[in-house]
């Protein structure tokens, strides 16, 4: 069966950037990577506990003792809390986990319907509230298309509707060009914990092409270019002699060379006839 590569990893440094930005000695790589995992896990656990939508967590390190955590959310005021109470709690929690100074920043998502992770989180929450998955997916699809999304695909997998056998259900509208690297594809994944088991939710959004087609507008012109009639006629008249042989340089020296070659062949033929 065909498998799909993650749209982010395929487009790194084309129209996507790394979610962890740091560079240290390779001996420290595993330790810092584990710290990044702890920071993301504890932050998501805390914010999900107070029921806030989080799209992404970006980690930036300039030195070993200071970590900057950027949280993307459509409701920054709620995440910050009253006088920054929630940020202070998150900072204290992460400091205990990684024993480093934590600087937390909030990034607002102005258009939540254009964020695949936010859409996936919303669908997962409604599935946990026993909403009909068919109506839910179709309504989410229509609402995203009405906002200006060029393409959307939603797929849910698991024991849908309490069925004994797990299956998948998918809806799609518009274009999702996964093989086009210049396409701005947003991807989100969430899990709905129902009484029948876990249901996975995947969302793909196509927001348009970031790199214009005019950049590669001349691609293929050399292959598809056909010689003009003037060039063909000039080649036929000037580059082929009377006996159908190609002339590399149409000058006096070349013509004399061809005439000498033809005379030598005729002399050799006449000599063989006389010997017979």
UniProtKB/Swiss-Prot annotation:
Gene that encodes the chain: rpsC
Organism field: Borrelia duttonii (strain Ly)
Region forming the signal peptide: none
PANTHER family found in the cross-reference section: 30S/40S RIBOSOMAL PROTEIN S3, SMALL RIBOSOMAL SUBUNIT PROTEIN US3C
GO biological process: translation
Top-rank lineage group of the source organism: Bacteria
Gene Ontology molecular-function annotations: mRNA binding; rRNA binding; structural constituent of ribosome
KH type-2 domain location: 39-110
Function: Binds the lower part of the 30S subunit head. Binds mRNA in the 70S ribosome, positioning it for translation.
Subunit text: Part of the 30S ribosomal subunit. Forms a tight complex with proteins S10 and S14.
Annotated protein name in UniProt: Small ribosomal subunit protein uS3
Entry GO CC: cytosolic small ribosomal subunit
Keyword RNA-binding attached: yes
Keywords for the protein's UniProt record, in alphabetical order: Ribonucleoprotein, Ribosomal protein, RNA-binding, rRNA-binding
Similarity annotation: Belongs to the universal ribosomal protein uS3 family.
